[in-house]
Amino acid sequence: MAVGKNKRLTKGGKKGAKKKVVDPFSKKDWYDVKAPAMFNIRNIGKTLVTRTQGTKIASDGLKGRVFEVSLADLQNDEVAFRKFKLITEDVQGKNCLTNFHGMDLTRDKMFSMVKKWQTMIEAHVDVKTTDGYLLRLFCVGFTKKRNNQIRKTSYAQHQQVRQIRKKMMEIMTGEFQTNDLKEVVNKLIPDSIGKDIEKACQSIYPLHDVYVRKVKMLKKPKFELGKLMELHGEGGGAGKPSGDEAGAKVERADGYEPPVQESV
């Protein structure tokens, strides 16, 4: 019999000794997710993060997290087919302050609108808001039968499709270019732009089911805490000295040394 080490036996202890199981949730904390003041329901849920440990700070793990929330949950509404994306930009205490990050229609709504015997018209445009956010907007609309129409199909001619697409782009650019992000979100909640496009295109070809189907965030300006606090309705003067609190610069000669005090 060959004499040698038994490699199967682990060093110092029984073979296959069990590791102590540590519950991963014992090292984590719950944080509240707060939606901006444009929405009726501000507290949209909770999120988990590992506690601050050494150089790994908990708030850094939360910043940049994106939450997709149905408009029904944000507005306390029963019927809503739009989903809003909210991104965590700052953490205050146990609250994650979020900002608008995008919008989308639900899949079932999008699929329910696509039918036979009609023309689907899509348009997209890049718009910069007054406060420096660059958004890409996607719009969709469908042709419908005229009131006295007998024919089964309602297809628009290529020239009409181009005219409608041009109108869509003009209206979206005009509506969003002159507003800041807060006003843009306020317009997206009821989707008033879809109704405006429907009215404007009535003379070219009657439309129905016109929606801004998607909003993508392409570029953001540099993060400012004051602006985020304004969005959350908590005032913009966070961390700034007000009026009398602002200090004045004291002029001192070069090589100045304070006098030695006799008693402290």
From Swiss-Prot:
InterPro entries: Ribosomal_eS1 (IPR001593), Ribosomal_eS1_CS (IPR018281), Ribosomal_eS1_euk (IPR027500). Residues 242-255 have a biased composition (Basic and acidic residues). It is found in: Cytoplasm. GO terms for cellular component: cytosolic small ribosomal subunit. Keywords: Cytoplasm, Ribonucleoprotein, Ribosomal protein. Pfam families: Ribosomal_S3Ae. The keyword Glycosyltransferase does not apply. One of its GO terms (biological process) is translation. Residues 233-264 are annotated as: Disordered. One of its GO terms (molecular function) is structural constituent of ribosome. Belongs to the eukaryotic ribosomal protein eS1 family. HAMAP family: Ribosomal_eS1_euk. Component of the small ribosomal subunit. Mature ribosomes consist of a small (40S) and a large (60S) subunit. The 40S subunit contains about 33 different proteins and 1 molecule of RNA (18S). The 60S subunit contains about 49 different proteins and 3 molecules of RNA (25S, 5.8S and 5S). This is Small ribosomal subunit protein eS1. It comes from Eimeria tenella (Coccidian parasite). The lineage of its organism: Eukaryota, Sar, Alveolata, Apicomplexa, Conoidasida.
